[in-house]
Amino acid sequence: MIFLTLEHIFTHISFSIVSIVITIHLMTLLVDGIVGLYDSSEKGMIATFLCITGFLVTRWIYSRHFPLSDLYESLIFLSWSFSIIHMVPKIRNHKNHLSAITAPSAIFTQGFATSGLLTEMHQSAILVPALQSQWLMMHVSMMVLSYAALLCGSLLSIALLVIRFRKNIEIFGKDNYLLIGSFSFGESQYVNERSNILRNTSFLSFRNYYRYQLIQQLDHWSYRVISLGFIFLTIGILSGAVWANEAWGAYWNWDPKETWAFITWTIFAIYLHTRTNKDLQGANSAIVASIGFLIIWICYFGVNLLGIGLHSYGSFTLTSN
């Protein structure tokens, strides 16, 4: 009983904190230079990370298996992954405007997980035989981490497309720290070198110069984050193949989950390939990543909604009052 109470406390506290963090970040975007609010939001995300970690540890102890056996637990883990991505720039002592993506993503996933739709999964259950393996932690954790990274990178690409194809762009704030330090851990020199070429040209306005810088930052970091997610996805698929061979006697069975995982891998492999061609970088590669954003959600929720295939153990049914 005490473990269930702790789970309830951790989930509601983390959800409340991340809601406050989003409000604070909206205020900092509208009113530039409020250092106190920015620091408070960063501390709030750290508290959110600790609360979600506490939930996962509590459920792990209570259920006696790694908490990634169903959609409810994977959504909580996905929210935890978003909080990790959020804190990486903070560890490197850089301004973190990735929170405009990670904080809403965390509250969306956690809000859906704690909603009434997944009530039947809130209670931990005994693992089905197919999941009683040491590969559970390796395979599922890598897949969920890849979803988090690929979703963040895809959202950065979508933001790039919105800014690039919008005729009139308003940059938040007057300072250029949003453009120089928002998404970089030290690669701002790369952007500065490219932007110095444009600084001396007469046909670009002051606004277009900073607009170009922002687009370059988004393009650079969408590539970095998606590359990391692609590595996680590859490891997850390979470990899943080994696990499938042990559990079902075949490395690949082409069930819906595996098929969409392969499609997801292919889409982002195409994205990385376009990055090797300078003529396809920027908007072209961002379009591919934007398509990948939709594919990820189909891969993640598709089988759970259909409830068919070898991965149907994580499916759920919509509950009604």
Curated annotation (Swiss-Prot):
Pfam families: Cytochrom_C_asm (PF01578). One of its GO terms (molecular function) is heme binding. Keywords: Chloroplast, Cytochrome c-type biogenesis, Membrane, Plastid, Thylakoid, Transmembrane, Transmembrane helix. Its main location: plastid. It comes from the Eukaryota. It is a multi-pass membrane protein. It is found in: Plastid, Chloroplast thylakoid membrane. GO terms for cellular component: chloroplast thylakoid membrane; plasma membrane. InterPro entries: Cyt_c_assembly, Cyt_c_biogenesis_CcsA, Cyt_c_biogenesis_CcsA/CcmC. May interact with Ccs1. HAMAP family: CytC_CcsA. NCBIfam families: cytochr_II_ccsB. Required during biogenesis of c-type cytochromes (cytochrome c6 and cytochrome f) at the step of heme attachment. Belongs to the CcmF/CycK/Ccl1/NrfE/CcsA family. This is Cytochrome c biogenesis protein CcsA. It comes from Platanus occidentalis.
